[in-house]
């Protein structure tokens, strides 16, 4: 409960002497594919709709409503999105795994005197459930934002770096004037991320603490 309360408070609890680093959630901090697949499968069973859940999890990142448009007519999308979000805690939280290096990455940000802020397209209450369940100690969470829309939240929190796995995350970083650090753990490969304008490309988060140490040293030089 204490962690959930902390995630609902966007204000720093102490002085910030290091960088504010923004992070995407799905396929950046967490591997949510098993849980998302299970939720879509349950939605298909409940509604009788044909949904290829295996295909769905190959293109995570954009807002839920965009994916819904592949499986439901426009007039049903709001209701189906609401139903999906209601079903999500039952089917998705337990099956989701932390990405390799996630805890070390957040610890590195804190060790540098910084803050870790999650900015995600996911429904915010469900994003917070994931972080609490996996013990990922983010300092703030902002949900329901995608691509350029993430820029406002990143600016509000003073993020100088944004880490994500999708070209939409690169666009969000660019909009905020933040350094774009891309990881190739999601649907976009290194070439796509580079073409989109990523400043740094890492294979996964296990490489992030060393990169951050170099970045902080350079900024303080």
Regions found by a protein language model. Give the residues of each.
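N-terminal helical cap/lid subdomain that shapes the substrate entry/recognition surface
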Residues: 5-103, 112
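Well-formed, non-transmembrane alpha-helical positions, independent of function
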Residues: 108, 130-133, 153, 172-175, ...
């Amino acid at each position: 409960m204490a962690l959930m309360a902390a995630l609902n408070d966007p204000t720093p609890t102490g002085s910030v002497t290091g960088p504010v680093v923004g992070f995407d959630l799905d396929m950046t901090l967490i591997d949510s594919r098993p849980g998302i697949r299970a939720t879509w499968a349950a939605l298909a069973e409940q509604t009788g709709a044909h949904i290829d859940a295996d295909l769905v999890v190959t293109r995570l990142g954009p807002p839920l409503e965009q994916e819904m448009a592949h499986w439901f007519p426009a007039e049903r999308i709001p209701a189906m999105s609401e139903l999906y979000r209601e079903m999500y805690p039952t089917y998705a939280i337990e099956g989701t795994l932390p990405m390799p290096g996630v805890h070390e990455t957040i610890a590195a940000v804190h060790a540098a005197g910084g803050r870790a802020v999650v900015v995600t397209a996911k429904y915010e209450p469900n994003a917070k459930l994931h972080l609490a369940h996996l013990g990922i100690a983010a300092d703030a969470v902002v949900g329901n934002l995608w691509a350029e829309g993430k820029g406002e939240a990143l600016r509000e929190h003073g993020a100088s770096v944004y880490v994500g796995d999708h070209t939409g995350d690169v666009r969000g970083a660019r909009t905020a004037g933040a350094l774009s650090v891309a990881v190739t753990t999601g649907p976009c490969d290194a070439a796509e991320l580079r073409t989109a304008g990523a400043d740094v490309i890492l294979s996964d988060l296990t490489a992030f603490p060393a990169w951050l140490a170099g970045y902080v040293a350079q900024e303080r030089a």
